[in-house]
Structures are given as structure tokens and as C-alpha cells.
Amino acid sequence: QALDLGTGSGILAISLALRHPQLQLTAGDLSPEALAIAKENGISLQATVDWLVTDVCQGLPQDRAYDLVVSNPPYISEAELDLMDESVKRYEPSMALFAEQGGLAFYRQLAKQIGSYLKPSACLILEIGFRQGQAVVDIFRRAFPQAKVSCHQDLNGRDRYVQVEINE
């Protein structure tokens, strides 16, 4: 079972579904409009995904537990607006980009809510802002003290995603 939270256009969920057809994939987003686009994209690419309106974990089925959780959530702080490319500011919905609490609101909510939706051995892979690595690592180390939590860099050497490996 795999879960994509904050799916937006569905690219992560669709890519996983096509590359790993054995996965049962669920993708959630707060925006019904984004989900409609994601669903269209999934249909056009023949990807099997269960699309749900979710607010972080609210709206997820209570009877499912996930092995893998991926997310490219809103993580940009309002203070970083000037660092953004004009095309992104012009064409991307602000709710898909910006998060409160210095861009960390989604990660804090996820760390509090996701535990009951995970299998005993699970992995979370979360895209982050290039200035957020240590903060997101700390959030998940506090929430899952037994987990291996690591930050990984992109080709430019900037923090790009945090991986949380849980083995209970």
C-alpha cells in the first residue's frame, strides 16, 4: 500500500502506479480541482490510483495501513516569496506552494497524524524546501524516535527530501 499526500496534478502517484503496478495506490489532496486534474491525468496514462479529498490524514480510510508515503506538499514560507521564479508565482495555486509556520505546517501535522496509518515497517519520502532539512528531520525524529530519519540532497547539493524509515 502506498500513499501520496498533497498529490496536486498526481505526478508522484501516477509515476509510482506505472512503475510499480503491484502497489495499491491512494492519493489525496485538499483541492477537489487538483484531484479532478490528477484523476484525468491518471486515466489518460492508464494508472490505477484511488483519489481522495484529504486534509493531511483527515479523509483517509481508517482501515488502511501504508508501507510507503510520499509527498511534495506546500512547503514554501511567505518569507521566501522573493526567491521564487515569476512563472511559478504566476501559474501555481498559492495553496499548493505556501505553508504557515515557516513552511513547516504540513510536516508538523503529518508527523502528528500519520502514525496510525502506517504499517510496522514503513517509509516516508517527503520533498522539502532547501532551507528546511534539519527542521523537518527534527520534527520526524521527535515524532518517531526509533526511526531512521535522514535528509538527502539534490544534484546541486541542496537539501531536497527527507526519508523516514520506520521498523518496529
Model-derived features with residue positions:
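Short, well-ordered coil/turn elements that cap or connect secondary structure elements
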Residues: H20, Q46, E92, K119, ...
